[in-house]
UniProtKB/Swiss-Prot annotation:
Pathway: Purine metabolism; AMP biosynthesis via de novo pathway; AMP from IMP: step 1/2. Its cofactor is Mg(2+). Keywords: Cytoplasm, GTP-binding, Ligase, Magnesium, Metal-binding, Nucleotide-binding, Purine biosynthesis. Homodimer. CDD domains: AdSS. GO terms for biological process: 'de novo' AMP biosynthetic process; cellular response to cadmium ion; IMP metabolic process. It is an enzyme of class 6 (ligase). It comes from Arthroderma otae (strain ATCC MYA-4605 / CBS 113480) (Microsporum canis). It catalyses: IMP + L-aspartate + GTP = N(6)-(1,2-dicarboxyethyl)-AMP + GDP + phosphate + 2 H(+). IMP binds at residues 12-15, 37-40, 129, 143, 220, 235, 299. Gene3D superfamilies: Adenylosuccinate Synthetase, subunit A, domain 1 (3.40.440.10), Adenylosuccinate Synthetase, subunit A, domain 2 (1.10.300.10), Adenylosuccinate Synthetase, subunit A, domain 3 (3.90.170.10). Substrate binds at residues 295-301. This is Adenylosuccinate synthetase.
């Protein structure tokens, strides 16, 4: 049976910990979309692991890991991340991670183009990670991309990469990029990659036929989805439920649970509308207390209050069957906590979440104010040990989402800092 873990906001919700917890029982852990632009951290046995393109199921010694067809893979980053895990003592990681032959290759060329495209947008910059993800997905959609399986044929790889480079030179003129150097690097990678490349359909079907436990690890989050996010300030892949099914070629009828990960407040990295953003001491307090710096970019995250309008929209699309509320402890020192319950535009309450980012920039927020608890929840592992007002905050969120249960509550960075209400 399949469990899918998805970010419900703009990413950085803390998906790594619940994925780590659930992967202990998983036999196959999959990444379905995105690339090394994603990032999350797992603390296991007092060792911190940063994951970007690799599935975090690698922390579990018996879990097989798959990077699916919906992803884009920067090969140097793949091997760099493997080396980092090796160096921290994880066993047999190189024997337990596979890449779909249908995944796309993200070249250094794409990162160069990413920077040029961002510079050309001026004040309307998307705020990308600069990793080349958008240009790589653009090449995929335009049917000129290079797949992981193409790497095994030297002639095919060279021809396609030279064609890409020539096209971008026609568009931009001079590029700070050497195609010969990238081709030479892939001559070294070819033999190293070969043991990792698989026919994804055969691998996934084998686990499905055995009724194995499969975990799909969503990257980024719903509000960064190319279709349903705050377009155009989004990533270039499908980051919701649909992308998880498509990117791993899952049988939808095998899905047992869809876990939405919800940060107890909101954050966002990069540009784009953020209705509940607090450009004041509240935002600064959340940023400092929450240590809100991006795992991939190191950029400060923008911070604001929890947004139930956004979460209801997210739940409508992803159909969560359970929630993991994270970083509850960051709210410990607030006298009162605000929650967005409605948007108004031109004085009228909106009935649905706006598709237009321009409209989102203009909305007026209707807040409900809840009492804080002014006592520590750090490290609490039992529901009954939470302060009463912290319990009420959790129950308020459940009620606002129509009764979707919050089954896990994060109360700190360590693996043990989790309340399991199952």
């Amino acid at each position: 049976m399949v469990t899918i873990v998805l970010g419900s906001q703009w990413g950085d919700e803390g998906k790594g910990k619940i994925t780590d917890l659930l992967s202990q029982k998983a036999e196959l852990c999959c990444r379905s979309a995105g690339g090394h632009n994603a990032g999350h951290t797992i603390v296991h046995d007092d060792i911190t692991y940063d994951f970007h393109i690799l599935p975090s199921g690698l922390v579990s010694p018996t879990c097989v890991n798959l990077i699916g067809a919906g992803t884009v893979v920067h090969v140097p980053s793949f091997f760099k991340e493997l080396a980092s895990l090796d160096g921290k003592g994880l066993k047999d990681v190189r024997d337990r991670v596979f890449i779909s032959d249908r995944a796309q290759v993200c070249f250094d060329l794409h990162a160069v183009v990413d920077g040029l495209e961002e510079a050309g947008l001026g004040t309307r910059k998307v705020g990308t990670t600069g990793k080349g993800i958008g240009p790589c997905y653009s090449d995929k959609a335009a049917r000129r991309g290079v797949r992981i399986g193409d790497i095994m044929d030297e002639g095919v790889l060279e021809s396609k990469l030279r064609s890409l480079e020539a096209g971008y030179r026609r568009r931009f003129g001079e590029l700070d990029y050497n195609v010969e150097e990238e081709i030479a690097r892939f001559k070294e990678y070819r033999s190293l990659l070969k043991p990792h490349i698989v026919d994804q359909l055969t691998l996934v079907k084998k686990f499905e036929d055995e009724s194995a436990s499969i975990l799909v690890e969503g990257a980024n989050a719903l509000m960064l989805d190319i279709d349903y996010g705050t377009y155009p300030f989004v990533t270039s892949s499908c980051t919701g439920l649909g992308g998880a099914v498509q990117g791993v070629c899952l049988n939808p009828t095998s899905i047992k649970s869809i876990v939405g990960v919800v940060k107890a407040y909101c954050t966002r990295v990069g540009s784009g509308p953020f209705p509940t953003e607090q450009l004041n001491e509240v935002g600064e307090k959340l940023q400092v207390a929450g240590r809100e710096f991006g795992v991939t970019t190191g950029r400060k995250r923008r911070c604001g209050w929890l947004d139930m309008v956004l979460l209801r929209y997210s739940a409508r699309i992803n159909h969560y069957t359970a929630l993991n509320l994270t970083k509850l402890d960051i709210l410990d020192d607030f006298d009162e906590i605000k929650v967005a319950v409605a948007y108004k535009l031109d004085g009228k309450e909106l009935e649905s979440f706006p598709a237009s980012s321009d409209a989102l920039e203009k909305v007026e927020i209707v807040y409900e104010t809840l009492p804080g608890w002014k006592s520590t929840t750090m490290g609490v592992s039992k529901w009954e040990d939470l302060p009463v007002n912290a319990q009420k905050y959790v129950e308020y969120i459940e009620h606002s989402l129509g009764g979707v249960p919050i089954k896990w509550i994060g109360t700190g960075p360590a693996r043990s800092h989790m309340i399991d209400r199952n």
